[in-house]
């Protein structure tokens, strides 16, 4: 209707997370999304409850291949869904991601502590 195009690239985690009731856990999904209305977004999703707020200046730890651990700010979706978070510093993240084969993201979850999600990104097609 608007004549615009959104672009997506997603990858599922190699490992599964297990959480207590009522959350199911399972594989996480890392999605890169570019839309005309809000630009580039990095979205991490799992059936759990992330603890990440831009108001508290929360961060996720990210490791690209065997490189050093890096910190990226994170924020919650505007609709307050707890099973999703947005990773800030999108351009820096994508620049590192394009050169990597493996990415490990560590985030904090409500009553579950910090958990790591590993992604094989060697075949991720993002332009």
Language-model features, listed with the residues they occupy:
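A generic "folded-domain core" signal
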Residues: 1-127
């Amino acid at each position: 209707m608007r004549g615009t195009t959104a672009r997506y690239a997603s990858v599922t985690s190699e490992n599964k997370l297990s959480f207590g009731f009522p959350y199911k856990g399972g594989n996480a999904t890392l999605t890169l999304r570019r839309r005309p209305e809000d630009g580039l977004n990095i979205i991490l999703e799992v059936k759990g409850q992330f603890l990440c707020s831009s108001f508290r200046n929360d961060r996720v730890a990210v490791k690209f291949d065997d490189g050093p651990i890096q910190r990226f700010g994170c924020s919650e979706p505007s609709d307050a869904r707890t099973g999703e978070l947005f990773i800030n510093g999108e351009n820096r993240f994508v620049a590192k991601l394009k050169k990597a084969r493996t990415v490990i993201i560590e985030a904090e979850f409500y009553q579950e502590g910090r958990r790591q999600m590993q992604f094989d990104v060697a075949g991720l097609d993002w332009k």
